[in-house]
Amino acid sequence: MAALLRSARWLLRAGAAPRLPLSLRLLPGGPGRLHAASYLPAARAGPVAGGLLSPARLYAIAAKEKDIQEESTFSSRKISNQFDWALMRLDLSVRRTGRIPKKLLQKVFNDTCRSGGLGGSHALLLLRSCGSLLPELKLEERTEFAHRIWDTLQKLGAVYDVSHYNALLKVYLQNEYKFSPTDFLAKMEEANIQPNRVTYQRLIASYCNVGDIEGASKILGFMKTKDLPVTEAVFSALVTGHARAGDMENAENILTVMRDAGIEPGPDTYLALLNAYAEKGDIDHVKQTLEKVEKSELHLMDRDLLQIIFSFSKAGYPQYVSEILEKVTCERRYIPDAMNLILLLVTEKLEDVALQILLACPVSKEDGPSVFGSFFLQHCVTMNTPVEKLTDYCKKLKEVQMHSFPLQFTLHCALLANKTDLAKALMKAVKEEGFPIRPHYFWPLLVGRRKEKNVQGIIEILKGMQELGVHPDQETYTDYVIPCFDSVNSARAILQENGCLSDSDMFSQAGLRSEAANGNLDFVLSFLKSNTLPISLQSIRSSLLLGFRRSMNINLWSEITELLYKDGRYCQEPRGPTEAVGYFLYNLIDSMSDSEVQAKEEHLRQYFHQLEKMNVKIPENIYRGIRNLLESYHVPELIKDAHLLVESKNLDFQKTVQLTSSELESTLETLKAENQPIRDVLKQLILVLCSEENMQKALELKAKYESDMVTGGYAALINLCCRHDKVEDALNLKEEFDRLDSSAVLDTGKYVGLVRVLAKHGKLQDAINILKEMKEKDVLIKDTTALSFFHMLNGAALRGEIETVKQLHEAIVTLGLAEPSTNISFPLVTVHLEKGDLSTALEVAIDCYEKYKVLPRIHDVLCKLVEKGETDLIQKAMDFVSQEQGEMVMLYDLFFAFLQTGNYKEAKKIIETPGIRARSARLQWFCDRCVANNQVETLEKLVELTQKLFECDRDQMYYNLLKLYKINGDWQRADAVWNKIQEENVIPREKTLRLLAEILREGNQEVPFDVPELWYEDEKHSLNSSSASTTEPDFQKDILIACRLNQKKGAYDIFLNAKEQNIVFNAETYSNLIKLLMSEDYFTQAMEVKAFAETHIKGFTLNDAANSRLIITQVRRDYLKEAVTTLKTVLDQQQTPSRLAVTRVIQALAMKGDVENIEVVQKMLNGLEDSIGLSKMVFINNIALAQIKNNNIDAAIENIENMLTSENKVIEPQYFGLAYLFRKVIEEQLEPAVEKISIMAERLANQFAIYKPVTDFFLQLVDAGKVDDARALLQRCGAIAEQTPILLLFLLRNSRKQGKASTVKSVLELIPELNEKEEAYNSLMKSYVSEKDVTSAKALYEHLTAKNTKLDDLFLKRYASLLKYAGEPVPFIEPPESFEFYAQQLRKLRENSS
């Protein structure tokens, strides 16, 4: 063995290098390439151990089979989405807990199988999940699961390659599964799958796990003949092999052999040696080795120490566990690792050791109720731990305050697992502690017996309830007991006979609900007549509705309804029998489908007529609801029959007289000649000239008719002059604007344009004065405003204007015109970095944090400091960051700075700091920088150093590395990544596999895996490439890098240089550059590039995304005419614009009052609305808004009314949403329009029973803070309160928004009956929790509990999280699962009930 290893010394050194020589990498079976056999279509091979599958079924596959099984585009897309979803679910579980629950893996497996088509990634994902990620399963169960997955996916068409075999090997190793490595190799060769380095490494490990050194030597010999490098993983396996063969001396000597071969033993090798000592119970050698490691530069993580603990425990030496636990540093990643070890120990029946580790976990016990031990207790229940042990564990967990209610939780687990005997024993223990036992505790036990109709089992559980002093409630009887018997009477008799009927009245009411739901209306009528107890119609309504639908006896329908209407026992609500029965009829019809109503039309007609003869009446507003339902069900003939029940049949109301308005004259000259007002027409003409960029003519027109100019015309002219860089003209126009109306306000974009041009021309004080005016006049600040300020400041910074940057920034922030964000504070540091003044740059960055809590450009400052060796300043920066933002942030800042500057040794020390964990956003940020700057070595080091970083997404890291290799055309390095992915057992996403395959193909290399098919055609292939008159790769590469770095000016300068030298890039480069430049500051340059590309590349066009961005930019710059033209061009090219782009155009036209162009856009998009995802209401709302803007309010209202009341409706009334129109009218303070809209909405409600508009208007009033107006509207139109679905949807949407608790509360105060709705008080609690309003949340909870309202788990979970956040005790047992779990549970419950 030693000779084999030493002879491979030169190869080991080669393997340790970042890149092997090309000659070595092309050797057959080398680390980078596979044998020619592996290039054949991969066989659908089965597991190779133990003859799991027959050879015929394992290896039969033909190349043409792939053609037969080709999938459609839609199917491929579905499979891709399916894999992404599965990966996301499993990845999330691993990141959060370090493990995968069996149920989740089973669900992903089942869903994947149901999808019908499978790629290699699906199989790889599922196989790799069957090892150590399943600590809750026994080892043999894990392997069995893996084999089942292999068999099933093979039948479904999965194609296996070497990565799948390697994954199966990994599972075998993790599960200690015994198999024949030689048979495994033979099966692979039969399947035309060539083993690679990873395969051989894992086969060696399999021999070593059973102490077979001879077998390992054979595999090592194979590796030598194939010139494969022997890595540390092989040496670590050999340590284990010698130890398990009883040869500890040679196990220790492996470390010496490693050093002789040029490899220094790493943490993995020492861990193998430590585990070997632990398996022998040799605590002394373990301690000595740990001390040796501590003195070296190596670092063993807590998870490594936990593995040593497991080795001691499993080998029968639990007495040494405490000594190893003392050495645990409790890194942040420790908890999930410890939890997984605890689960594994319980699985191995080592519960006492598991408890010892659990009690040693560093869990805070001062943050309110704790449930940390829940996972341990639940798994103990699953593994059938004796009840005596369980109660003892619960007692210990409670004593140390690690779990606030361990017994109750364990009981909960036993009930869910249907472990009856354990549950009963635990209930007794819970009761002995003084806690009440509720009826619903027994439901999980009853449900199984109900399914089996096990009467004796039901009786035993009911007796058990009596023993514990628990009486069944109505739900228990209705849902679980009565369904087991032939009838309610037989159930009563048998229960009485067995002494299980403790509350006869409770059972009677439950029996009524049960028989009603089953359609036994004879029983219901008889019961209601003879009953002496008051029963609320509300309590039996849902059961009665089911019964009515299941019985066709109209006489019974009528008699029961009459009894409910006339008997005071059943209609005790304040609203009286008329309204109660009215709502019952409405709910009856609403609960039916349209086909059911049509089938029962005659029965319903008879029902209505019989009720009319019985003098049963319903309110008018409820009749209207019924009428709308009947219309939507296409049975209008029933409306007249339902109308018979209305209390007052006078449904005619006086129509409100509509007002009229004058029409505008056609031309300015005609108006002037007739000596009539011309202001409106003059303004419109100014606006048109501005849109055409005709500045000279617009200014001439202004001078000619100056006395008739209005503020809107001046505003447009100011903006035009700013665009043309005419600073003096803009200032003069602004002065005239102020003289005309000192209170007038420009819109935000025009103010920003004016500030920008003033700052650019050095008029700093004028610019600051404009900023002050923006504040004084309370100008609306948009999202784009802060970005515009940044560009203005950054331009000054690059020019080195320190005082300009400082004063403008201070003015903007002090006046509150922009948040002092990191982005807007960048120029403050940039101006000093440009001058090389690092000390001042750091001081300014620190000053920004002290003032604004942002730290701009700290990475760039640190890199400069590291490069200059400014240790004092580095220490100062790090001390500050650590103190203010925490040690984790400081470590990442320093890590990235060291990486960026090539100080990899220091970077390694940082990333190995105990407790550090992956911050995905920060890692991705640095990866993007490396890719954009083409920093290959830096990114490679990042990927290498983060290999063992907790929660690091290794696939994403390798994907970033491959992106860089793709740019550089480096297939050799990309090929090495494929081996590393397998070595690390990483599950590659489809995008990673596609990218790797693309790189290999571009290098004329074979692809050694099945490539997932694309469901779409990549945009870049649709761009027409052009052969340049002169090719200059450096220019093109530079411009692409500048684009990735978001360096607009730099990219544009490269374009100009290339243009001067007559260099033409390909179409894709120009598209990227145009998209980059398409911002407010560089729009002109973007159009210049576009024009150049169009004249130099035949057929050049922007793609859908770029054109959509162009449209949005044109709208933002108020180039509406150009935006409409661009939209037309996009559609002519058969492209699909984004919904956002189209919506922005329409909304901007509406704000200008441009009805004509909105209609033009509508015609252009005719038939394309669905593909864009554009609602017809976008046009309806904005055309109406445009008409209102033109003071043509009556026309807007008339159009809306016609659409809602005509027979041929464009949109059904219930979907006719006018909320946008109402909101804009209210925001713009268009009072005449608000008044007329209110009249229209009320008229539609009162005359036509169309309540959607008035309800939308009511809600918009509330949302705008006009609560008194909303209250008055509600008093005039009470039907608003009955539009429950609309109201609840509004509450739900607002509960998701920050700062909307007052809005939600206002709606509930105005409509108190909504408070009874579960969705309503859930929304209110959600709002309180988001705003951390503990006092209001407490009041809500106390109010609901006082009314005995049944609160769902999601409500309680939210409330509990708020109390814990505030450091207050939780007055109930907090639901143990996640928010997502309870939200999904509630969603399913509602879907089932509907």
UniProtKB/Swiss-Prot annotation:
Species for this entry: Homo sapiens (Human)
Disease: Mitochondrial complex IV deficiency, nuclear type 5: An autosomal recessive, severe mitochondrial disease with multisystemic manifestations and early onset. Clinical features include delayed psychomotor development, impaired intellectual development with speech delay, mild dysmorphic facial features, hypotonia, ataxia, and seizures. Brain imaging shows bilaterally symmetrical necrotic lesions in subcortical brain regions. Mortality is high, due to episodes of severe metabolic acidosis and coma.
Alphabetical UniProt keywords: Acetylation, Autophagy, Disease variant, DNA-binding, Leigh syndrome, Membrane, Mitochondrion, mRNA transport, Nucleus, Phosphoprotein, Primary mitochondrial disease, Repeat, RNA-binding, Transcription, Transcription regulation, Transit peptide, Transport
Residue range covered by the transit peptide: 1-59
Quaternary structure annotation from Swiss-Prot or TrEMBL: Component of mRNP complexes associated with HNRPA1. Component of the complex, at least composed of LRPPRC, BECN1 and BCL2; the interactions prevent BECN1 from forming an autophagy-inducing complex with PIK3C3. Interacts with CECR2, HEBP2, MAP1S and UXT. Interacts with PPARGC1A. Interacts with FOXO1. Interacts (via N-terminus) with EIF4E; the interaction promotes association of EIF4E with 4ESE-containing mRNAs. Interacts with exportin XPO1/CRM1; interacts both alone and in complex with EIF4E and 4ESE-containing mRNAs to form an EIF4E-dependent mRNA export complex.
Tissue expression summary: Expressed ubiquitously. Expression is highest in heart, skeletal muscle, kidney and liver, intermediate in brain, non-mucosal colon, spleen and placenta, and lowest in small intestine, thymus, lung and peripheral blood leukocytes.
Protein name, UniProt field: Leucine-rich PPR motif-containing protein, mitochondrial
Lineage of origin: Eukaryota, Metazoa, Chordata, Craniata, Vertebrata
Sequence positions bearing N6-acetyllysine: K155, K187, K226, K292, K463, K613, K726, K750
Positions of transmembrane segments: none
This protein's encoding gene: LRPPRC
PTM-bearing positions, type Phosphoserine: S1026, S1027, S1029, S1138
Signal peptide: none
GO molecular function: beta-tubulin binding; microtubule binding; mRNA 3'-UTR binding; RNA binding; single-stranded DNA binding; ubiquitin protein ligase binding
One GO process term, biological-process aspect: mitochondrial RNA catabolic process
Modification sites for Phosphothreonine: T1136
UniProt-annotated location(s): Mitochondrion; Nucleus; Nucleus, Nucleoplasm; Nucleus inner membrane
PPR repeats: 126-160, 161-195, 196-230, 231-265, 266-300, 301-335, 403-437, 438-472, 678-709, 710-746, 747-784, 785-820, 821-856, 954-988, 1031-1065, 1066-1102, 1103-1137, 1138-1175, 1176-1210, 1317-1351
GO cellular component: condensed nuclear chromosome; cytoskeleton; membrane; microtubule; mitochondrial matrix; mitochondrial nucleoid; mitochondrion; nuclear inner membrane
Function according to Swiss-Prot or TrEMBL: May play a role in RNA metabolism in both nuclei and mitochondria. In the nucleus binds to HNRPA1-associated poly(A) mRNAs and is part of nmRNP complexes at late stages of mRNA maturation which are possibly associated with nuclear mRNA export. Positively modulates nuclear export of mRNAs containing the EIF4E sensitivity element (4ESE) by binding simultaneously to both EIF4E and the 4ESE and acting as a platform for assembly for the RNA export complex. Also binds to exportin XPO1/CRM1 to engage the nuclear pore and traffic the bound mRNAs to the cytoplasm.
